[in-house]
Regions:
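Cyclophilin-like peptidyl-prolyl cis-trans isomerases
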Residues: 17-248
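Positively charged n-region of N-terminal signal peptides that target proteins for export
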Residues: 1-4
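Bacterial N-terminal signal peptides
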Residues: 6-14
């Protein structure tokens, strides 16, 4: 079965055909002004797959722009306001009006070059990492060295510790409030250090954050954006046209 629809992006992204090689792995051909890009949607991320198909079939992406293009990073689309935007207009705030529960399946799916992922609001307002209903991005990224990957692993480890620290602090907020009322900065610092020590120990008991060898190989050969792994839902990938600008 083949379906046709169009979406345009400031490159200009216009999606054109849907052709499934089987029912569980739909494939979409995205026509742009600089070349065609074909993506497949992963069967395991069912909510994101079904949502993308629904929006594409009803023409949501017809004539839409790639409103965010960052060299060596990614290109992003899905703002319906871009269909009628004048030159120079600020874009990125438009969406479907709903979100999709996160389907983060790292390390099965990750931000290698060509990955298709859902945009979302930041953790400060979106701690459950729910995805945008309509906005998505395609990963360009860059090839990384072993040293770069080591730094990313170290930063990821620290973020895990910090996130757990925040959870543990939240569970001890009454105790912390008592110390704050006393205005004893020494005790407050000691309390925070104690909680951070617990967080670090718990994270280390699970093992250090390390990229699996196949993932490491991809980031050192084709490239990607590893610092976004386990943060955003990756729900597909480019299967043809990865060398179309700006992916070349």
């Amino acid at each position: 079965m083949i379906k046709t629809f169009v979406f345009t992006c400031s490159l200009i992204l216009s999606v054109v055909s849907f052709a499934g090689n089987n029912d569980s792995v739909p494939v979409y051909n995205i026509k742009t002004t600089v070349g065609d890009i074909t993506v497949k949607l992963y069967p395991e991320t069912t909510k994101h797959r079904d949502n993308f198909i629904k929006l594409a079939d009803k023409g949501y992406y017809d004539g839409i722009l790639f409103h965010r293009v960052i060299n060596n990073f990614m290109i992003q689309a899905g703002d319906p306001k871009s269909k009628t935007a004048v030159k120079g207009a600020a874009l990125g705030s438009g969406d479907t009006g709903y979100t999709i529960p996160a389907e983060i399946l790292y390390p099965q799916y990750y931000h290698k070059k060509g990955a298709l992922a859902a945009a979302r609001q930041g953790d400060d307002v979106n701690p459950k990492r729910a995805s945008s209903g309509g906005q998505f991005y395609l990963v360009k990224g860059k090839v990384l060295t072993e040293g770069m990957l080591f730094s990313i692993e170290r930063d990821k480890q620290r973020k895990l510790e910090k996130d757990l620290f925040q959870e543990l602090i939240a569970a001890q907020k009454e105790e912390l409030k008592k110390l704050q009322l006393k205005k004893d900065q020494t005790q407050i610092a000691a309390f925070n250090d104690s909680i951070m020590g617990i967080a670090r120990q718990k994270i280390r008991e699970k093992g250090e954050y390390k990229l699996a060898l196949p993932i490491r190989k991809d980031y050192k050969t084709i490239g990607g954006i590893p610092h976004l792994d386990n943060e955003y839902t990756v729900f597909g990938e480019i299967v043809e046209g990865i060398n179309a600008h700006p992916f070349s």
